[in-house]
């Protein structure tokens, strides 16, 4: 079994961002990295949305950014504005392409799909794979949304609506 200085288990958003940060900060110049990820190819499969509270290296992957938002509840909605913490959405397809293009230039980085055993004696191991059973006492935040296309402009794309829509 080949030894690696670093092993990242899980090549999704977290694992790839760690690999990318190591690469762009020149931490892999004389080190080897194995990324263990079962998927055969990276394709657009998600959209990640978040409040931008710190600068990040993925502004070129942002597909939309909002400074105006509305919080909707059963009792009504409240429109708010933020100048310093925009709400942003990143397209996973752009994200995967950017990171994999960068990582593919370093011959010390290898991707593996099927690994049955890992020798952990001489490696730093980073595991970004969530537990298969979630502890019910922990908070799990997950939003589900849909992208729709309409024939007429009926939405204000300058404001993000958070919460249940009022019909």
Task: Show the residue positions of the predicted features.
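Beta1/beta-strand and adjacent pyrophosphate-binding region of the FAD-binding site
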Residues: 1-14, 34
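Anionic group-transfer/hydrolysis microenvironments
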Residues: 7, 39, 129-130
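Predominantly flavin-linked oxidoreductase catalytic cores and closely associated redox partners
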Residues: 11, 21, 25, 102-164
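N-terminal FAD cofactor-binding segment of flavoenzymes
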Residues: 17, 21-76, 94, 144, ...
């Amino acid at each position: 079994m080949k030894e690696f200085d670093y092993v990242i288990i899980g090549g999704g958003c977290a694992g790839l961002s760690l690999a990318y940060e190591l690469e762009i900060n020149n931490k892999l110049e004389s080190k080897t990295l194995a990324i263990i990820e079962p998927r055969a190819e990276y394709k657009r499969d998600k959209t990640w949305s978040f409040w931008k509270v710190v600068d990040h290296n993925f502004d070129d992957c942002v597909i939309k950014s909002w400074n105006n938002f509305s919080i909707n509840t059963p009792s009504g909605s409240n429109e708010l504005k933020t100048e310093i913490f925009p709400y942003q959405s990143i397209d996973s397809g752009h994200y995967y392409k950017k990171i994999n293009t960068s990582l593919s230039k370093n011959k010390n980085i290898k991707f593996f799909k099927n690994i049955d055993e890992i020798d952990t004696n001489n490696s730093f191991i980073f595991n970004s794979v969530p537990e298969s059973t979630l502890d019910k006492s922990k908070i799990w935040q997950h939003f589900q949304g849909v992208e729709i296309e309409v024939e007429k402009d009926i939405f204000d794309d300058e404001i993000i609506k958070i919460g249940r829509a009022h019909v």
